[in-house]
Each structure stands twice: as C-alpha cells, then as structure tokens.
C-alpha cells in the first residue's frame, strides 16, 4: 500500500497549498466581491472569424486559460478563428508563422501564473456570473488543418480542454495541467502526452511510432484504429485503477506488488506497428 499512501499524501498536500493560495488571494484583494469587480472590469471578449493562415509544417502553442480545437479543413489551406476572453489592455492571442512553424501564444497570462495579478484575472470563478457564462460559451480557439502530415506538433495548456480531429503528425507532444484531451481520427508518430488532471479519450486512434502517455488524475479511454488494433504493442500501468481490454487483443494482466495497481501488456504477432506505454496514477485505462 505504499503507492496509495504516497498518492493520498500528495493529494492532501496539493489541496492544502491550494487552500492557502486562495486565502492569500482573498486577503490581498480585499475579499471575493472586490476581486470579482477587478477581474470583470478588466476582461473583454475578443472574436476573430475564420481567417486563412500562411503555410506551415509544424505547430507550437502555449496557452494558459483557453480551449483549443483542431478540425479538418474543407480545402488545402489552414485557417484560424477564436472567440476568447482577454484583458482590455491588449489582444489575448499572438499568432505568427515563422520558418514554417505556426506559433500561438497567450498574451495575457504566463503558463505558470507567477504573480497575483495574473491569478486574479485568470481564475474563472473570480469573474461575475455573466462574464463567466460568456467565457464558457465563447468556444476558444479553432484551428482548421488540411489533410497533410505535420512534422511536429507541440501543445501546452495550463487550463483548458484540447480536442483534435483528423490530425497527422510525425512528432506530437501535449501537456495539459487542468483539462481533458480528446483525439479522433488521429495518426501520431513519436508522441508524448502528459495530463495532470483530466481525462483522455481517443477514437480511431493510430500510433505508428513510440508513444508515451501519463495521466496523473483521470481516466484514459481509447478506441484504436484497425492498424493499431492489430499491430500495436501495449504496456499499460495504473497505480490506483482498473485496466480493461477486449479479449481479442490477446493481452494479459500481469502480477504486481501492489494490491491497488494493475499492469497489462499486449505483444502482437509479427513486427509491431507502434509502441504505446500508458500510465494512469489515479484512474482507469479502458481499451475498446
């Protein structure tokens, strides 16, 4: 039970630190009502309709508080639109294409939220009800991509959901501190996915390289493509949660030294088409 004790101790520490941080914010701002007034007065809604982008072969995005959605384009061009909240001082999103790389940067916040002002304007619950509802319905950022394989995709979100449909990438990395990741009709080569708190779902998902997935708190539920369903080598571990997979996979649940941990391994016949290593610390792993 050592792993369980470690998990509970870590979770307790995080909650204590979070409570202390919120108390400090309240004291600094003079109370929740004043904090809401400050945050609401500084926020503004920004809209950009679907706009064509210059050609690029890689994506590098760092966003603090925003949902990001990647969809297939209707033609051979890439497009971007957004409906997001930001401060009144400047537009919330910097977009550029340099040396074949599309860069998306959050102009209002840093990923670490390292100072009190950013935290005051960043946490959604500090906004008045109308502003918070407007943010929730705003839609976030939508990126439309043509049917081509990108060389590299790196996506970092501090707080927000990431939804991807139809992406093909030779290298892929996603790091989400608070939010979920949904992958549909997606083909990934060398991949690294890290979710601190949120769920992972995948439908018609292909891994044709080495893929590593870490989910700290949340479930992972994956439906593989026919190619990966037959040829993917799978090594799955949970510290506290079940692992389920179809009998047709031909994998095995292996013995572990911990009563709450599980280990599943599937080795396909012939040469593997890819290699998936997935670990969930507090959550289930489900293959369909």
Regions found by a protein language model. Give the residues of each.
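Positively charged n-region of N-terminal signal peptides that target proteins for export
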Residues: 1-6
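Hydrophobic membrane-insertion alpha-helices, especially the h-region
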Residues: 7-26
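Acidic/polar low-complexity surface segments
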Residues: 113-134, 247-266
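Short, surface-exposed interaction patches in beta-rich subdomains
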Residues: 183-288
